[in-house]
Regions:
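Catalytic cores of histone-lysine modification enzymes
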Residues: 52-136, 179-180
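Intrinsically disordered, low-complexity regions enriched in proline, serine, glycine
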Residues: 33-36, 46-47, 84, 93-94, ...
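Intrinsic disorder
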Residues: 18, 28, 39, 69, ...
Length: 180
């Protein structure tokens, strides 16, 4: 991994993730901004991610899945959580970016011509939602594309300690090698 500076951020990369470190974006009611740095839980530090969104990033309960996103408080059914964000790429830009790998593990289709790629950690915490395939559980969140953004909504109540799980769709599950 190599480091470089980018707009006041520290950046390190590996083959599928670009790790970006920035200052937490939380601003208190008195106008003071949190001084903590964040690399994983953008735009907030881990403390403010728990406080604002009611979730935290930690090792997934699904073998081989890497990191997952977990509730730290009760989240009712039919609640908007946050957007799935990242680089907005045309299909040709996406194809060029993943020519060697064949697919983007953090990519989601916004529309037939635009793909959101959350390969950078500053794309936000939605990138840590794992697929329910292989978990023995059912999805508890879903992706909803408005055509301008992809929103994450709960589809059943989520209790503290529950991992947020979504249906990635057949094409992605096959690309990940989870089904044939």
């Amino acid at each position: 991994m190599g480091n470089r500076s980018r707009r006041g951020s520290q950046v390190a990369t590996n083959s599928i993730t670009e790790y970006v470190t920035k200052q937490c974006a939380f601003v208190a009611p008195d106008g003071t901004r949190c001084r903590r740095l964040t690399t994983i839980t953008h735009p907030y530090c881990a403390h403010h991610t728990r406080m604002v969104h009611g979730v935290e990033v930690r090792r997934s309960t699904i073998p081989g899945a890497g990191m997952g996103l977990f509730a730290v408080r009760h989240i009712p059914k039919d609640v908007y959580l946050f957007d799935y964000d990242g680089d907005r790429l045309s299909v040709s830009e996406y194809t060029e970016r993943y020519a060697e790998l064949g697919f983007g593990p953090y990519a989601i289709e916004l529309s037939p011509s635009v793909i959101i790629d959350a390969y950078r950690t500053d794309a936000g915490i939605a990138r840590y939602i794992c697929t329910y395939h292989g978990s023995g559980r059912r999805p508890n969140v879903r992706y909803y594309s408005t055509g301008r953004r992809v929103e994450i909504w709960t589809i059943r109540p989520i209790e503290p300690g529950d991992e947020l799980l979504a249906d990635y769709g057949r094409e992605m599950v096959v690309a990940l090698g989870l089904v044939r």
